[in-house]
Amino acid sequence: MTDLSLVGIVGGGGYIGGAIARELSKKHVVKVIDIREPTWNIKDYNISFCRCDIRMFDCVQECLQDVDVAIHTAIIQIPRINEEKRLGFEINYVGTMNVCEAVYRSPKVRGLILTGTWHVFGESGLAGVVDESFGYRPDKVEDRARLYVFSKIAQEVIVRYYDEMSDKVYGVVRLGTVLGEGMPEKTATNIFIERGLRGESLTPFKHSMYRPMLYVDVRDVVRSFDIYVNKILNNEVEMRGSSLSRVLNLVYPEPVTILELAEIVRDTIARLTNGKIVPKIEIVDQGLQPLFTEDSKYKFKVDISKTIKFLGIEKLIEPRRSIEDLVKIRLQHRM
């Protein structure tokens, strides 16, 4: 490996891809591969831009031809995937095939890492030990999330198939719901923080307030991808065993329910404002059947020991600290 290794980040204009790109540019040359340029200025970093519609194989192949490692973060998410199903299929399925095939054919690219998600496990009925081999349960999510989860499972399966038939690394890092500045506006965490800082009530829905969520801090995401990339470049990824050996669960192991999330945000805002702002929590009953019970989070245990060992890190940032740091940043912006 040299300091001039080139990392190509497909979908690098998005939140997670952009965060990874900026972090990796400290040690590598980075190329963002996306249909739109990032909203942040790539000239501030060691980053170039290659415009590409990943539905077009020739374009993908051209953009990836000179990279050493590829990271695939492109995805059509909720709610757009439900509004434009064909686009979701073409980007999430065909696009992923194109990225994997371009890596497969390239004499230069050493491997690929996919940003996966914990949602492939499903959300309801989690029980027992949840580790990398827990399995896929796309029918254990809300209807609005089904096509997204289908897509993330399909992306994993495509990547893992290439891993099984190639001598290159095709890895997956399944992420918890990512916490960090710049995260999508419509996430529960962002909504709670913004409403809370305005002194408005935090309004979890009654039917989902006990939903156990798995989170990860964006700082843990970027450092983990940095480590994984370096392992590929240094030939330190063990290639024996099935493709599951190259799959990692990157989540803080203690689940947090939506109600607990609201309570953490409320308490954090109250403490950091010295009691000047203490948002109320008001449960909203939409008349829907409850999907979870108060003890749902205690019915399963998350095992991330494989991830900790593979990455060589001691522990992950807990969600409570992530939220505290986010609230501090938002308060500074309001001064």
Feature roles, as predicted:
Residues 6-26:
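N-terminal Rossmann NAD(P)H-binding glycine-rich loop of SDR-like oxidoreductase domains
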Residues 75, 86, 90-97, 110, ...:
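Conserved internal alpha-helix in NAD(P)-dependent oxidoreductase domains
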Residues 97-147:
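Conserved Rossmann-fold NAD(P)-dependent oxidoreductase catalytic core, especially the SDR/UDP-sugar
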Residues 147, 151-154:
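Active-site helix of classical SDR
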Residues 200, 204-335:
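C-terminal substrate-binding subdomain of Rossmann-fold SDR/epimerase-dehydratase oxidoreductases
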